[in-house]
């Protein structure tokens, strides 16, 4: 029997999609198919070819193709969805809902048709609602449809903590709960630097400022760029999740998972600590929360539900 490389399709060849494809190829996680709409087929092919031509220099073996034909994605092991319109300065995530929901429905139909056994990771904003849309549209079990926000939000939190303490980011661990928006809940009590609780290392006022900056992290970059939104850190976060599934690493990572009673919520996609491995979301980890944290999470859930109400 011939051993085959894994196949990963990335839907949406904008900054985030293309960067994700490039990181996946560099990590040799599988062959990569980069997909966009027919009007953008040539630029998509150009990006894929450009990446492929870097492989002799960077020393990775992975085939990368660009296409607008979903038939090229057939039998993908993992499909990453980054397609959708981007958020512009002054635009709330909620403004994106109706347009991106239509895009999610179209994309999901094609994905399911050609890769009925794949795992789907959704990045498109507002990500909690878009992941729910893909879940409903696909008919897949909940463990195979996953949203990405917590890895990114936690990466931002870890970055700011490392800067504050002037230490390696590798030594900082943390968790962000809830929706991917201004009401996310960075769990300071469960965050450490070199195994030492952050509360022992950083004064409360500084920690509060870091939490606030984490909440506004996406908006900070949108405003600095002036056009478009973050893509390097989101792409790296997607690649970490893809790697956890493909290599069956059983990583404890924050992910947007479908809740059926965990944390007291039902029938909603929300950012929670999960075990991510070869079977997708293998477990939702329930942490003990203080009353204050529960209240913050409830506020975050309400924000997600407000977006969900816009869904058609």
UniProtKB/Swiss-Prot annotation:
Binding-site residues, NAD(+): 12-17, 36, 100, 123-125
Keyword Oxidoreductase: yes
Gene3D superfamilies, per the entry: Lactate dehydrogenase/glycoside hydrolase, family 4, C-terminal, NAD(P)-binding Rossmann-like Domain
Listed EC numbers: 1.1.1.37
Keywords: NAD, Oxidoreductase, Phosphoprotein, Tricarboxylic acid cycle
GO biological process, one term: tricarboxylic acid cycle
Any Pfam family the entry gives: Ldh_1_C
Protein name, per record: Malate dehydrogenase
Gene field: mdh
């Amino acid at each position: 029997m011939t051993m085959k490389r894994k196949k990963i399709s990335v839907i949406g060849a904008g900054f985030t999609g293309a960067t994700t494809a490039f990181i996946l190829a560099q990590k040799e996680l599988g062959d990569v198919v980069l997909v966009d709409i027919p009007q953008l087929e040539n630029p998509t092919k150009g990006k894929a070819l450009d990446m492929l031509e870097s492989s002799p220099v960077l020393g990775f073996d992975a085939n990368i193709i660009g296409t607008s034909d979903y038939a090229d994605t057939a039998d993908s092991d993992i499909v990453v969805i980054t397609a959708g319109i981007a958020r512009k300065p002054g635009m709330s995530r909620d403004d994106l809902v109706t347009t991106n929901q239509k895009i999610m429905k179209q994309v999901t139909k094609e994905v399911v048709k050609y890769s009925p056994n794949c795992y789907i990771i959704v990045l498109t904003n507002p990500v909690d609602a878009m992941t729910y849309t893909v879940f409903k549209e696909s008919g897949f079990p909940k463990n195979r449809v996953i949203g990405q926000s917590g890895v990114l939000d936690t990466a931002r939190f870890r970055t700011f903590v490392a800067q504050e303490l002037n230490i390696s980011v590798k030594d900082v661990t943390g968790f962000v709960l809830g929706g991917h928006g201004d009401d996310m809940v960075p769990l300071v009590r469960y965050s450490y630097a070199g195994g030492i609780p952050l509360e022992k290392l950083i004064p409360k006022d500084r920690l509060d400022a870091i939490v606030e900056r984490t909440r506004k992290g996406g908006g900070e970059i949108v405003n600095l760029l002036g056009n478009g939104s973050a893509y390097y850190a989101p792409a790296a976060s997607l690649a970490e999740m893809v790697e956890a599934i493909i290599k069956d690493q059983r990583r404890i990572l924050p992910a947007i998972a479908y809740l059926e009673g965990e944390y007291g919520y039902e029938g909603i996609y929300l950012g929670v600590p999960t075990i991510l491995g070869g079977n997708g979301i293998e477990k939702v980890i329930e942490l003990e929360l203080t009353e204050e944290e529960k209240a913050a999470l409830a506020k975050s859930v309400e924000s997600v539900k407000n977006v969900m109400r816009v869904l058609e």
